[in-house]
């Protein structure tokens, strides 16, 4: 049996400003730094054998706040890097609505049918993240590990492990610094919990939109 903790990075200024992040290397803001410290504390008593992170700094800093309690290194893991938004990267959501009205509407309505201009599709993200997860399961047989990634990869992984296709993307919530727990036993996935942020209550921050 293996436990896989899937964590989203902490808050950045671009989350608050509803700016498409993707491969842009945006650091955590002060709230994000507080969030990831609490996320790390929430997992400090768990038995963890490895911590993997998207190579982007917002995820790496989140992962380091988890790994430090277990005295294990953080391993950058390219398969879980954020989606490439291509031409949308660095643009505010409202700007994208105005510049790409039909494509933005399709993204909101049928996200599985869109490929971002100069970027990726959800199917491409699913292919690389699930292949990466399978490789780690083979490497860490009967061990527990953490993956720290981003909103889109996390939602796609959750859909896959729930047996859902990518059309269900918007039905999965992934708040900043949230944790999901999946248990792999006898070749099957068991979902223990999704989008846990109970450890962030002390911050008293308002909920952001799904961005």
Short names for language-model regions:
Residues 10, 151, 197:
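Active-site metal-binding loops of divalent metal-dependent hydrolases
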Residues 60, 131-190:
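Active-site-adjacent alpha-helix immediately C-terminal to a catalytic or transition-state-stabilizing loop
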Residues 19, 79-80, 109-114:
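Short linear capping/connector segments at secondary-structure termini
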């Amino acid at each position: 049996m293996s436990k896989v903790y899937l964590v989203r990075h902490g808050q950045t200024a671009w989350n608050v400003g509803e700016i498409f992040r993707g491969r842009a290397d945006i650091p955590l803001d002060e709230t994000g730094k507080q969030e990831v410290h609490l996320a790390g504390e929430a997992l400090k008593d768990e038995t963890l054998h490895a911590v993997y992170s998207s190579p982007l700094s917002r995820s790496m800093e989140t992962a380091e706040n988890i790994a430090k309690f277990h005295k294990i290194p953080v391993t950058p893991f390219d398969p879980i890097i954020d989606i490439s938004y291509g031409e949308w990267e660095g643009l505010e959501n409202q700007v994208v609505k105005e510049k790409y009205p039909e494509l933005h509407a399709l993204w909101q309505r049928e996200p599985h049918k869109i490929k971002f201009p100069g970027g990726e599709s959800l199917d491409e993200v699913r292919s690389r993240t699930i292949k990466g997860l399978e490789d780690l399961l083979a490497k860490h047989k009967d061990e527990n590990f953490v993956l720290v990634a981003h909103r889109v990869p996390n939602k796609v992984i959750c859909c896959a492990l729930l047996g859902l296709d990518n059309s269900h993307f918007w039905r999965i919530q992934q708040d900043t610094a949230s944790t999901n727990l999946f248990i792999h036993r006898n070749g099957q996935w068991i979902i223990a919990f999704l989008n846990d942020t109970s450890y962030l209550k002390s911050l008293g921050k308002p909920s952001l939109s799904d961005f």
